[in-house]
């Protein structure tokens, strides 16, 4: 859809993800493995289209579990909290914690108990795609998607150029 990824599969066919796009943002992600849907995520955004969390639903369940992001002043997602309950009695339980080097390379990823987890684990820390600066992280490639191009934190470079819209006067006009 308009040059946006709507599907992703790994090389051995072990899983497939489908993305539902709403405007510029991914509204929903469905993860399929072993012949069926394993979970569905619905992303939550603020009025400026910045990610603030997601709802998660497992198959054969009508219940959605909500998770909200903790961000530092730079916009890095440094924590994910699971919301339990409603209203004044709601509590927020730490589900994941992240840290990064200055270029966006993940330096640690832990579950709510503080135990290190891998990008391939079936944990909230690995499932959540929003990380450094609030960008979408692709654990298969190690790249961040910045709405129009990909950033590689290892080389500290963008892997593709910005789109160019002609003004009829060249790139300096």
Question: Predicted regions: what is each one?
Answer:
Residues 1-8, 20-29, 45-54, 71-79, ...:
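A short glycine-rich beta-turn/N-cap micro-motif
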Residues 1-4, 12-19, 36-44, 63-71, ...:
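A structural detector for short beta-strand units
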Residues 6-15, 25-27, 32-38, 51-53, ...:
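Extended charged/polar low-complexity repeat regions
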Residues 56-60, 123, 131:
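A short, mixed-charge helix-start or loop-turn motif at secondary-structure junctions
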Residues 58, 134-136, 150:
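Short, flexible loop/turn elements at secondary-structure junctions
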Residues 84-86, 91-114, 140-143, 147-149, ...:
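Short turn/helix-capping motifs enriched in Asx and small/polar residues
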Residues 112-113, 119-127:
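Gly/Ser-enriched beta-turn/beta-hairpin loop segments
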